[in-house]
């Protein structure tokens, strides 16, 4: 198999891994897949956690290694890179769409408060800086009165 084909297959396998904390999105859509390289005959994948100390980093690395093994790369290496640091700006347009479809307001630096993912209102308030995961906060829509999580801008 040609190196470019192997690299494309490895990238597709790594990119398909869902985030364990937000399984509707892949690590690629969240912008955590930093690099996929072919070094000699070995595939090396670099992932960037969404924040320092993210508890999902180890399970994500294990899931990437498993996905690569299933794709025919049993000796692949997965490493964590911290620089450049992850930013919520790395979330793809598709990732933002999937967050909203899952009831999680995507991050938007241009807005003072996140828009309600249910009704679209910008009239929201933060209830708690802490959501189900450290990368999210709990909000409430003042229009439809529904609570929702919002992905924090980093």
Give the label of every model feature segment:
Residues 1-154:
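Domain-level signature for proteins that mediate thiol-based redox and metal-cofactor handling
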């Amino acid at each position: 198999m040609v190196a470019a084909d192997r690299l494309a297959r490895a990238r597709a396998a790594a990119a398909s891994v869902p985030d364990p904390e937000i399984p509707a999105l892949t690590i690629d859509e969240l912008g955590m897949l930093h690099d996929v390289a072919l070094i000699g005959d070995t595939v090396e994948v670099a992932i960037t956690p969404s924040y320092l100390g993210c508890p999902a980093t180890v399970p994500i690395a294990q899931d990437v290694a498993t996905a690569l093994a299933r794709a025919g790369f049993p000796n692949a290496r997965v490493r964590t890179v911290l620089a450049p640091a992850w930013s919520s700006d790395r979330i793809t347009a598709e990732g933002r769409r999937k967050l909203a479809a899952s009831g999680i307001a995507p991050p938007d630096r241009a807005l003072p408060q996140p828009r309600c993912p249910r009704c679209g209102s910008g009239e929201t308030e933060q209830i708690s800086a802490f959501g189900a995961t450290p990368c999210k906060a709990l909000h409430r829509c003042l229009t439809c009165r529904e609570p929702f999580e919002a992905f924090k801008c980093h």
